[in-house]
Amino acid sequence: MIIPVLNYYSCTRSNYMNEVDDNGNEIHGEYDNSKVKIIFFGQGNKIIFKEKIKTKKLDIVCDGNNIYIEIGKSCIINGHIRISSDCKLIIGDNLLSQFSNGYYIGEGCSMTIGNDCMFSGGITFRTDDSHAIYDVITGNRINKGKDIIIGNHVWVCENCKN
């Protein structure tokens, strides 16, 4: 069975934006080049670039409703962000993430990255496993999603997986 995507919006512009689409999805801010791809599969989502970001390639997929993303000042970020309904991603100022990394936020969780952080490459951040695991005896779910909080001045090494 194929389910059509009703609320699809893609943006690849390279200038200042202050846009709201027909589904209430908002993009505010500026980035360096046309290598940022933003896709909405939902409504009522908001992305804020507080200041011009630099990137070689950044894909942002908002896969649901009521998503909030805020990227701070003077950030260099590359990779893939996939975020689900009712989730939040807050990136502080001066993030240096020159290589491709993955940020996957689901199950109503949030990820917060402090100021002045540096990330190497091949890093995957996940708030959840994106599938349920149940205890065979109790039948209770044992892998519920949790928030990720990274403080200020944190270095994350190459190929680190959360």
Task: Go through the PLM ranges and name each one.
Residues 46-162:
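Flexible, glycine/small-residue-enriched loop-and-beta-strand segment within the central core
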Residues 1-55, 116, 129-134, 153:
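Terminal amphipathic alpha-helical/low-complexity segments used for targeting or macromolecular assembly
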